[in-house]
């Protein structure tokens, strides 16, 4: 066999695409970075695939009533944070204990659309939970 045939050639090696054409915003960021490179106000770009977690939840604010209104008439009541959390939200502070598992399918609770929240099937790669966990409701297996 010819030695040059043994070498695998990259068919895309001759193609050159400028980065600014791939991401138009990148060119603008590079221009801004070059003009104010000595500025300490710049923040580093995020380095992960995920967006940062919010540090706090937005709280409802009281809406002032119309002018001349007495008392709290026309004002929206301020609700506490517990009222804003949905009962099935796995990220709420009122979630079930971490690692709570069952020997079989968990019992159906009030308000459960599905009889369980199982993330243990082999086709679900969304988490690494133990069998029959109640952490998520994203599994495609439904046991009725």
Curated annotation (Swiss-Prot):
<feature type="compositionally biased region" description="Polar residues">
    <location>
        <begin position="78"/>
        <end position="98"/>
    </location>
</feature>
<dbReference type="Pfam" id="PF10631">
    <property type="entry name" value="DUF2477"/>
</dbReference>
<dbReference type="GO" id="GO:0061436">
    <property type="term" value="P:establishment of skin barrier"/>
</dbReference>
<protein>
    <recommendedName>
        <fullName>Cysteine-rich tail protein 1</fullName>
    </recommendedName>
</protein>
<dbReference type="InterPro" id="IPR018904">
    <property type="entry name" value="UPF0574"/>
</dbReference>
<comment type="similarity">
    <text>Belongs to the CYSRT1 family.</text>
</comment>
<dbReference type="GO" id="GO:0051702">
    <property type="term" value="P:biological process involved in interaction with symbiont"/>
</dbReference>
<comment type="subunit">
    <text>Interacts with LCE1B; the interaction is direct. Interacts with LCE2C; the interaction is direct. Interacts with LCE3A; the interaction is direct. Interacts with LCE3C; the interaction is direct. Interacts with LCE4A; the interaction is direct. Interacts with LCE5A; the interaction is direct. Interacts with LCE1C. Interacts with LCE1D. Interacts with LCE1E. Interacts with LCE2A. Interacts with LCE3D. Interacts with LCE3E. Interacts with LCE1A.</text>
</comment>
<dbReference type="GO" id="GO:0070062">
    <property type="term" value="C:extracellular exosome"/>
</dbReference>
<dbReference type="GO" id="GO:0001533">
    <property type="term" value="C:cornified envelope"/>
</dbReference>
<comment type="function">
    <text>Component of the stratum corneum that may contribute to epidermal antimicrobial host defenses.</text>
</comment>
<feature type="region of interest" description="Disordered">
    <location>
        <begin position="51"/>
        <end position="105"/>
    </location>
</feature>
<dbReference type="GO" id="GO:0042802">
    <property type="term" value="F:identical protein binding"/>
</dbReference>
């Amino acid at each position: 066999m010819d030695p040059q045939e043994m070498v695998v050639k990259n068919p895309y090696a001759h193609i050159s695409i400028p980065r600014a054409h791939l991401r138009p915003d990148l060119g603008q960021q590079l221009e801004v970075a070059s003009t104010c490179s000595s500025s300490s106000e710049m923040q580093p770009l995020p380095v992960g695939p995920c967006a940062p977690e919010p540090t706090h939840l937005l709280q409802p604010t009281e809406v002032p009533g119309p002018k001349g209104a007495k008392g709290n008439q026309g004002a929206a009541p301020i609700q506490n944070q517990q009222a804003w959390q949905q009962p099935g939200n796995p990220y709420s502070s009122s979630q079930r204990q971490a690692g709570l598992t069952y020997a079989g399918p968990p019992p159906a609770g009030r308000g459960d659309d599905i009889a369980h929240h199982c993330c243990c099937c082999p086709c679900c790669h969304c988490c690494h939970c133990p069998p029959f966990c109640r952490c998520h409701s994203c599994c495609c297996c439904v046991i009725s």
